């Protein structure tokens, strides 16, 4: 990924307190301030909850978008400490390398439904799964829609596996009827087991 966007040339920022459509419009406005051949890019990268959208792109364009969005009423525009502008079109070169690797990676049909975060679909075909994994490297994470799709399938509790509890917290902010539980160590495993018993 660092080959695609060298450290220090890309950026991400969380935009808080603003509707995602306003964020998208602000990104377009920011990008329009640069020459079309400048290579400056800023896009919505993560739709985390109804009032939090993460933007990503080239450093100058992200900074300009933050300036525009704060002036337009965003409560906060927080630069994120990341090494690359993930889920943006600048990651396409890295995605192409990922696609090559995925072509030779065995993938079986899931035994439980998995909602992918790029088009909010449940893929069961190995090639569809590969394509979704490829596209998610340079396309936005549609977490708000994923949570709605998971709920529509009858889920009431979402378990976040891995370090931290960001998604569990976002889930609660997206839909208060859902429970989000983090699972990252023996103590949280016990909590999840108790909650699901």
Show where each model-derived region lies.
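Alpha/beta catalytic cores of group-transfer enzymes, especially the acyltransferase/condensing modules
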Residues: 1-140
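Acyltransferase/transacylase module recognition
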Residues: 103-197
